[in-house]
């Protein structure tokens, strides 16, 4: 298992050579993924940013840093293959879920759901509940889904593409449904990255509480 300090050092290798202006851009981009107060924008350092990323996304910190770097038009490959958590949940654990619990990360749940949709894997009870949002998206966003598909076919990605989802209490679930429809076309990994980019931590937490209450 990779120790946390080793992971921090690996991430720091990508940040240490950034200019001050580039780092400011990185901080601005990080606000989509991390809780940053107004004070953080002027006082946060590269070391503390790395610590925040590792703390918030222990299993996906490499992916988060790679997404953030895209704002600088830099495509980086952060080589961290080993899970930081001592007992990672295997994929089969998600396949048989019948309800959401506090110890399950919503990002893990969404990533596996998108993969099941892309690979046409039978859904368990909890995923069937989530899948109702995909059916709703097919009915409500047929034109918009076509436009998103055209964009992807032209550019090969959906990074920074504006999803046609109104911001309201259903924003997270509707975004999941929309991206689930696209998952077989764009691939579950890119669908998941778009979810991480587009849906804030606050909205994810609200949706997780909603799932846990059902």
UniProtKB/Swiss-Prot annotation:
Q: Would the keyword Lipid biosynthesis turn up in this protein's UniProt record?
A: no
- Expression triggers: Expressed in the early phase of the viral replicative cycle.
Q: Which Pfam families does the entry mention?
A: Poxv_Bcl-2-like
Q: Which residues form a coiled coil?
A: none
Name the source's superkingdom: Viruses
InterPro entries (alphabetical): Orthopox_C1, Poxvirus_Bcl-2-like
Kindly indicate whether the keyword NAD belongs to this entry: no
Q: Give UniProt keywords alphabetically.
A: Early protein
Family stated for the protein in its record: Belongs to the orthopoxvirus OPG034 family.
Write down what this protein is called.
Answer: Protein OPG034
Biological source species: Monkeypox virus
């Amino acid at each position: 298992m990779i120790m946390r300090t080793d992971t921090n050092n690996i991430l720091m290798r990508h940040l240490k050579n950034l200019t001050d202006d580039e780092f400011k851009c990185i901080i601005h981009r990080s606000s989509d993924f991390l809780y940053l107060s107004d004070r953080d924008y002027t006082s946060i350092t590269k070391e503390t940013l790395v610590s925040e990323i590792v703390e918030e996304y222990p299993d996906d910190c490499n992916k988060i840093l790679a997404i953030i770097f895209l704002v600088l038009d830099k495509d980086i490959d952060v080589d961290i293959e080993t899970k930081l958590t001592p007992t990672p949940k295997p994929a089969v654990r998600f396949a048989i879920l019948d309800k959401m619990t506090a110890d399950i990360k919503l990002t893990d749940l969404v990533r596996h759901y998108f993969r099941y949709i892309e690979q046409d894997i039978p859904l368990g009870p909890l995923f069937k509940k989530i899948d109702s949002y995909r059916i709703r998206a097919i009915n409500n966003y047929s034109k918009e889904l076509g436009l998103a598909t055209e964009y992807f076919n032209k550019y090969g990605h959906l990074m920074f593409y504006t999803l046609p989802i109104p911001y309201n209490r259903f924003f997270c679930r509707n975004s999941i449904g929309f991206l689930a429809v696209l998952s077989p076309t764009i691939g579950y990994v890119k669908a998941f990255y778009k979810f991480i980019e587009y849906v804030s931590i606050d909205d994810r937490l609200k949706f997780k509480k909603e799932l846990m209450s059902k």
